[in-house]
Amino acid sequence: MARLLFSGQRLRPSFLRSYIRANPSSTPSATRAAINYRYNSNNAALQSASSSQGALTGIKIIDLSRVLAGPFCTQILADYGAEVTKVEAVGKGDDTRHWIMAGEKASWNESSGPISNYFAAVNRNKRSITVNFKKAEGRQLILDLIKDADVVVENFKPGTMERLGLGYDVLKELNPRIIYAGLSGYGRTGPYRTRGGYDPIAAAEAGLLHVTGEKNGPPVRAGIGLVDMSTGLFLHGAILSALIARARDGTGQRVDASLFETQLSLLTNVGLAWLNLGIEAERWGCQHPSIAPYDAFKTRDRYLVCGATNDNQYAALCCLLGVEHLVTDPRFITNPLRVQHREELAALLGPIFASKTIDEWIALFEPSGLPFGPINNMEATFAHPQTAARDMVIDVPMDAACAGSIKVIGPAVKFGDSKTGLRTGPPRLGQHTVEILEEIGMDAEAIAKYKEDGII
């Protein structure tokens, strides 16, 4: 970060800006102008990008993470324009390259090395380099990459990076501006810090599985890695915040995220009901613990989720269903009463929903303004008109695919002025090793020797 000479000392522009705001009359106008100019120019990578660039164009990220939470985080940052270098194990790569579904193998070119849809889902817009962490030369390569980077992301067990000589203290000494983002199962401190991090385990221990499933049934795991991806979302926001803090203060910092804490934070109102009222949470299936009716109702052919969040919506729903008399039924006049008598209300509404097809109900609900939606399978989800309208399915060229391209799910957030989206498809294992090493100054002979020695 730019430093300025002030009263014989080198001080941060952020301090100087605070000083001139507090002492405007004692600071010459030329000095104020110079300080403001230097302050606003100190981190060019975070200046406003043009419409042809991503919001994070110029930010360099070294991604040492594997599987889902970390790669999901770095893919979001890559979609926003960051240059992400994915460091993988020699010969094997990210574990998810090998997580192939039945029947999937035939869609990939065998000569392209290990690859899967699971890996492709969270690794686009990245370059891949393979490095042997077990060799000192490999660890030195990692240091060489981090020396000029803005962010490093890793999801090893706490203490692993330190044992490799790649801990935060080492990296901070090498690059004081580095944002070190560590992700683990339980965080850097506490009695469980050395345990591995797994999505279903965090979901179990931090309460999610306890509240998920049918009322009288067993706990049910979400159909996606919800805790993993939520942790990636939290971490990507923390990294952006750390970058903004660095633009202000000039130095990087450590960011510490965990699956366990992510899931604890997601308990929100359910958690506060226990903490403040001592009310234990229950499983409610598709129902809402505080609102009735709100459920997945079986129609003649599929399920429809709908509900009424207030008395006006309840009256409108009753009218739409042709049961206006239930509006004034003393059991259902207010939401607390409807919650108290939810089973009786569901028994009355269930046969009505079962009398029509999902398409017939959608036609009735569409103009009503009531909250509703069919439970869609994957075919219906990706055929949804809103999916197409928001460009949420994108064809990406990919030579590893037999078809020459694969379809991926587009970025969830759109920017008004900055470019987001797909620049490159998911990389083959080690696809960019040579070009990355050339960028840090290695010649062809040295690269060949490293390859021969199993360092890359």
Curated annotation (Swiss-Prot):
Main subcellular location of this protein, as a coarse class: mitochondrion
Disulfide bond sites: none
Observed effect of gene inactivation: Shows significantly reduced growth but does not affect tolerance to benzoxazolinone.
UniProt-annotated location(s): Mitochondrion
Transit peptide: 1-33
Keywords: Acyltransferase, Mitochondrion, Transferase, Transit peptide
Name this protein carries in UniProt: Acyl-CoA transferase FPSE_08120
